[in-house]
Amino acid sequence: MADKKRYEELINILDQYSYDYYVIDNPTVEDAEYDQKMQELLKIEEAHPEWVTPESPSKRVGGEVLEGFKKVEHDTPMLSLANAFNRDDLADFDRRIRDKVGDDISYMCELKIDGLAVSLQYENGKYKQGATRGDGTVGEDITANLRTIRSIPMKLKKAYSIEVRGEAFMPKRSFQKLNEIREEEGQMLFANPRNAAAGSLRQLDTKIAASRNLDIFLYAVADFGEMGVETHSAGLDMLETLGLKVNKERRLCSNLEEVYAYIDEWTEKRAGLAYDIDGIVLKLNNLEQQRQMGTTVKSPRWSIAYKFPAEEVPTKLLDIELNVGRTGVITPTAVLEPVRVAGTTVSRASLHNEDLITEKDIRIGDTVLIKKAGDIIPEVIKSITEERTGSEKPFHMPKNCPTCDSELVRLEEEVALRCINPKCPAQIKEGLIHFVSRNAMNIDGLGEKVIIQLFSMHLIKDVADLFFLSKEKLLELERMGEKSVTNLLASIEASKQNSLEKLLFGLGIRHVGAKAAKSLAVHFETMDNLKIADKETLTSINDIGEKMADSIVTYFANEEVHDLLEELKRAGVNMTYTGPKLENMSEEELVFAGKTVVLTGKLEKLTRNDAKALIESLGGNVSGSVSKKTDVVVAGSDAGSKLAKAEELAIPIWSEEDLIEYLPDEGGLNE
């Protein structure tokens, strides 16, 4: 019988885990432990729905489908900021401040996050409502979608009733992954992380918002004075004590020279941030002085946003090449004269699809403007038409696949052209490269160049052929000596023991990513069970939507897939889930239960992944950084700063041999 006290305890534990991971960026547990606690919580909620509150961590995963977004009136208007584009604008702003309140001033300088301004309401410390800025007076209610952002606490550390303002955003890495998925699926790409964040928060299906990995920084309260603080900087510190995520890169500046230094610093460093910023915000720090300055109808007189100039670089578009992805999507790529953009040299940029090329009237031979979307992905902004000479050539997508000559099609609701020939050599080659990649079967020594050689020499035609390669055939490859071939064959052999989720992800089933593959493997345990699953069963699993379920059913209905799986079985490839199931182990077996272990340096007998998997299978958590919460540091050769920090904190340091003694005998390691 479920215990309500245990239920409340689980909520507090999961809230703390989320705070550690998403707010202060100091994870204290591994995903497996978090997932285990969440599953326990979900089982209790299923048995006792009357206990569930809006603050439950289970509400973060989405699932609610909204009918629309109702209007919300802000108690205090969400004003926009006036802009400064140069130092003269900042000097004028500073002069107006000094003329009004005198020279005893300071400015809190903060990074201007390029996202979507939102408002969060807490009542007695509990998250009540979230809204967009809208026109500043009336916004849209996006309470459910904001709840899916893990860095937004559902309960504050104190029972305040406050309205907090902040910027929701999509980290660069999440943006890149999202666009890669959308491109593979033939969907329109988001132009930048800001648009992606805004689009995600306006999804009627909250599961979609939850899948987008959004984040937030909070930067103000509707009225800081209600919190008993006298300065904006003290107010930000107070927000942190409440468990809210505030950007750490803020600085209190006493004069304009310090402000300029801060701007110069972040103009240089912004490309290295994990999120987009488009400027610096200055705020008069003293709250009483803010009140003296007042506001205009649109913006406060005590704050201003300095906007970074956009880095747009001209270069020549030499050609447009076509690439065929593993799912058949045809992607046009701009071949450019190499040019430096946002810190790196760019020679190629995706043009995404034919519609975009037509819309922007991009021609071969044009001088084009280049920037990096999210400071990561090279993007052609536009052609500089006034520099055309008449020699430029319009581009037209072909009607047939550039690799296999099959007719290209545009599927319903897709903007991309796609080759649907399952025997297309380009798709097979890309599928092979994906199959051996690190997140899939992780076969060391079998990189893209080796795959291309094997494929072009007709030594492999599908993924099963990899497991029947002989030493003699591999020695025929360029730059493959005796030692390289021996190591490669050992790596191929070792990959046969991978757990089911690795194989599933490697097979490249459309719409099935690494996370979904893990969910499928854990649920079905064997490939045979998964093969016969129907759509209803599949959609009952977390992370599996209707589109993905349809794709899985279609995939396993293919006779060629059945033949491929039989060949993989014949090769000895494991088709069962072999990951840790902590709930089935005794306390005596879980020798690392509750302990955090850090691995550093080069291990001789174990690979890093093997050591991590073994520690986790015995209840331990493997962390990437050393802190006071670390229980053991395992140091191999060439250990660096982590070892030094462990010594400084007096944390026990083990050798690899010490670790092996604590582990079960795996493949003769203890001999």
From Swiss-Prot:
Cofactor(s) demanded: Mg(2+); Mn(2+)
Gene Ontology terms for molecular function: DNA binding; DNA ligase (NAD+) activity; metal ion binding
The family this protein is said to belong to: Belongs to the NAD-dependent DNA ligase family. LigA subfamily.
Coiled coil: none
Organism superkingdom: Bacteria
Gene it is expressed from: ligA
PROSITE patterns per UniProt: BRCT (PS50172), DNA_LIGASE_N2 (PS01056)
Catalytic activity: NAD(+) + (deoxyribonucleotide)n-3'-hydroxyl + 5'-phospho-(deoxyribonucleotide)m = (deoxyribonucleotide)n+m + AMP + beta-nicotinamide D-nucleotide
Protein name: DNA ligase
Species in which this protein is naturally found: Listeria innocua serovar 6a (strain ATCC BAA-680 / CLIP 11262)
Documented EC number(s): 6.5.1.2
Residues covered by the BRCT domain: 587-671
GO CC list: cytosol
